[in-house]
Amino acid sequence: MVQKKLLMIVNPTAGRSKPRGPLFDAAALFSQAGYLLSIRQTESPGDAIKIAAECGEDTDVVVAVGGDGTLNQTISGLMSLEQRPLLGYLPRGSTNDFAASLHISSDPAAAADQILHGQRRALDIGRWNERYFVYVASFGAFTRSSYTAPQAAKNALGHLAYILEGMKDLNSLRPYQIRLTADGEVLDGSYLFGAVCNSTSIGGLMKLNPERVVLDDGKFELLLIPSPRTPQDLQNLVLALLNQQYDREGLVFRHVSSLHLETQ
C-alpha cells in the first residue's frame, strides 16, 4: 500500500506571538493518520507560491499554515499545476477572514482534525490578469492597511492592528474614477473603495452578510463604496455598511462572474 503524502507550507512570521506547541500537535495528528509528512517554511514573500508549484504534484494534500496571504499564495502556486492535490488550511494569521468564512477552527489541532475528517468542498478561485486569488482583490481606502500594519502589531493586536492602520488612511482618502463592466453592466463613477471578494469579511474591517455570500457558486461579490462629498455622507456610508444595507447611500453590491476595470 502506497503511503499518502502531506505537505505543510508554514509561514513562520504569521502569528509569531502564538504558542508553537499546537502546530506540533497538528503535525502529529497528520502523521498518526498515516500521512508521510513534509514541512517547508517560507523565508521570503512569494515562497509559498514557489513551494506549492514545485512540490504540489508530488503530494496528496497541501496544507497552508499562516494567514490569508499564505493561503492565497499557496493556491496561486497550485493553480499552475495540471494535477492538483487537495488543499487544507491551518489559520495562524491576524484576521483569518477566509478561515472564518469556511468555519475553520483557529486551533491548529482542531483545524487538522477538520482536514482529516471534514467534508471536502469546492471553492471559487478568482483570476485577475495572470494572478489567482481566493479571498479578495481590492483597491482604494484601507487596502494599504493590510500591508503597512507592522507584523509585530498584527501578531499582538490582530484585527485592531488593521483598524488602527486603516484609521490613518482617513486623512489621505482619495477617490478613484473608474469604469467597470461587470457581467455586461457598465458602472462609471468616483469610488473610495472597491473589492471583488469571496469572503464574509474584508481585511478585518468590513463584514458582509453571510446569507448573501456563497463560496462555490461560480461568482464573487463586488462591493463599491462611492466617494462621500461631506462628513455626513461619510457617516451615512459607515452606518449603511455596519448595518449591511448595500442598497443605500450609493453603495454597489453585485454577484459577478467576470469584470473589466479601467481607472483614470
Predicted regions and their residues:
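A generic structural signal for short beta-strands and their flanking turns/coil linkers
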Residues: 174-176, 190-192, 216-221, 255-259
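ATP/NTP phosphate-donor binding region
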Residues: 1-65
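Nucleotide donor/acceptor-binding cores
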Residues: 3-6, 85, 257
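Phosphate-binding core of ATP-grasp and ATP-grasp-like enzymes
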Residues: 195-206, 242-245
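Short Gly/Thr/Asp-enriched flexible loops that form oxyanion-binding sites at enzyme active sites
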Residues: 70-82
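Gly/Ser/Thr-rich active-site loops/lids in small-molecule metabolic enzymes
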Residues: 153-161, 201, 205-230
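Catalytic core of DAGKc-family lipid kinases
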Residues: 33, 42, 80-193
